[in-house]
């Protein structure tokens, strides 16, 4: 359903932000 789609999108979005933060703090990927 729609809620599952929203949850999945939110999870991917959050993981993406965490990954970007790690890259900036860690100095590259």
Swiss-Prot record:
Disulfide bonds join 23-29. One of its GO terms (cellular component) is extracellular region. The keyword Secreted applies. The keyword Secreted applies. Keywords: Amphibian defense peptide, Antibiotic, Antimicrobial, Disulfide bond, Secreted. Its main location: secreted. It is found in: Secreted. It comes from the Eukaryota. Expressed by the skin glands. Signal peptide: none annotated. GO terms for biological process: defense response to bacterium. Belongs to the frog skin active peptide (FSAP) family. Brevinin subfamily. Antibacterial activity against representative Gram-negative and Gram-positive bacteria. This is Brevinin-2Td.
């Amino acid at each position: 359903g729609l809620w599952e789609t929203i949850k999945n999108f939110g999870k991917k979005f959050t993981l993406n932000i965490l990954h970007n933060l790690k890259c900036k703090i860690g100095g590259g990927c």
